[in-house]
């Protein structure tokens, strides 16, 4: 195989891998616009890698214009392919007859419509678990069942019925389910057992993860240094205030450290000492430069120094402020489980959730990551992070009525009794 053939093989292998990471081939799960975006981003990453390979082999910078023209053609091709493939898929595979079973209340039907999944799932029944148990034969004609907030006993009955009849089941998990997903199956005393224990990653994984942190942070600092210099000048020129913003956050085992970010708010944004989450575009504390750098996550770049220092990792649960973590612990005691792993610059919840995703859902996402430590998963999250950089909904503020720590009586941070209870929760794993 000649060098050209090897390069072509590497290009298409990368395209398939990155396209799968970005869900660029999931016709049944993504809107056409999302498919086009994912495919275009996969082409952009592969084209960039190809450009670097050609540069290294030829030892001079190649003309970028042909590459840009080819990329425009790739976007057009991706759009045509996404439309035709989507049209073919849903003509070939009609929507699954679906039942939504809920415990108290479920928004699953609304979410299916909101995310454009009604082409994939045709919801025929939306019933409570109690009613379903009494008339479980109603599920006989279903192809798919969603379970949301269903008690374990009722859920087991429904699961057994569905699995025996080849019905696909999607379960919205609780915290216990997520913890159990990382259990180690074994046998002892002639009995099948599931071993569940505190998160303890293998030493070789931790060593390789730390090596990856150092390599990626150094490389990113070199590549991003021009952007960081321009950002620092812009922040200083806008209001003359400090360029960097330091804030105490919590990492593994609730150890406090100072996180470093580019300042995106006014210098006196929290002069009263009370922690407040951003409300997004409506937050008048954010400066003009701040809106730009927050939109593209440029304000996060100085955290690369935290990664080099060892307080942060490239991938892990996002670090919270102690006072906000105390509020989470007060209302979500399971939050302390999230502090078993080192905090990260990006994470599972950041990639697959939104800024205003509920704390409970984010907690479950972080625990899913912690339950299955893997360098391959880390690499997938790093690649997927690139995808969300240009999606505005990933940086939305806290919506009205959202169940965040700020909404859960943020004023209680000044209440000594509540604050002590939250601190006890945090210290419980130290």
Q: Could you tell me what each predicted segment is?
A:
Residues 39-43, 95-111, 242-265:
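Membrane-cytosol interface motif
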Residues 279-342, 381-385:
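A short, structured surface patch at a secondary-structure boundary
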């Amino acid at each position: 195989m000649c060098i050209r053939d090897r390069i072509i093989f590497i290009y298409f292998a990368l395209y398939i891998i990155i396209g799968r990471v970005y869900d660029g081939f999931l016709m049944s799960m993504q809107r056409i616009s999302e498919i086009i975006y994912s495919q275009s981003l996969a082409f952009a990453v592969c084209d960039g890698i190809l450009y670097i390979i050609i540069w290294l082999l030829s030892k001079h910078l190649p003309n970028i214009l042909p590459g840009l023209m080819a990329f425009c053609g790739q976007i057009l091709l991706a759009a045509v392919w996404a439309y035709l493939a989507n049209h073919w898929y849903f003509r070939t595979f009609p929507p699954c007859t679906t039942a939504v079973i809920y415990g108290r209340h479920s928004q699953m039907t609304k979410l299916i419509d909101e995310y454009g999944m009604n082409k994939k799932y045709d919801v025929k029944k939306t019933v409570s678990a109690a009613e379903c148990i009494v008339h479980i034969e109603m599920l006989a004609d279903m192809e798919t069942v969603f379970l949301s907030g269903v008690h374990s006993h009722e859920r087991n009955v429904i699961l057994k019925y569905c699995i025996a009849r080849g019905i696909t089941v999607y379960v919205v998990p609780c915290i216990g389910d997520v913890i159990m997903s990382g259990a180690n199956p074994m046998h002892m005393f002639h009995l099948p057992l599931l071993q569940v224990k505190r998160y303890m990653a293998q030493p070789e994984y931790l060593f390789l993860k730390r090596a990856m942190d150092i390599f990626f942070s150094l490389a990113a600092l070199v590549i991003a240094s021009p952007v960081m210099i321009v950002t620092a000048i812009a922040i200083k020129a806008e209001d003359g205030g400090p360029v960097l913003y330091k804030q105490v956050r919590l990492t593994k085992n609730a150890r406090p450290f100072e996180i470093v970010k580019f300042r995106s708010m006014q210098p006196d944004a929290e002069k009263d000492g009370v922690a407040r989450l951003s409300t997004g575009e409506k937050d008048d504390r954010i400066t003009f430069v701040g809106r730009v750098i927050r939109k593209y996550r440029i304000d996060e770049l100085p955290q690369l120094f935290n990664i080099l220092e060892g307080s942060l990792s490239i991938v892990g649960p996002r670090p919270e402020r102690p006072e906000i973590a105390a509020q989470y612990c007060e209302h979500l005691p399971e939050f302390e489980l999230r502090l078993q792993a080192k905090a990260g610059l990006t994470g599972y919840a950041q990639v697959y959730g939104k800024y205003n995703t509920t704390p409970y859902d984010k907690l479950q996402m972080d625990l899913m990551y912690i339950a299955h430590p893997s360098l391959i998963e880390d690499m997938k999250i790093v690649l997927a992070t690139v995808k969300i950089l240009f999606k505005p909904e990933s940086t939305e503020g806290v919506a009205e009525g959202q169940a965040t720590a700020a909404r859960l009586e943020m004023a209680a941070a000044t209440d000594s009794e509540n604050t002590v209870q939250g601190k006890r929760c945090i210290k419980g794993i130290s």
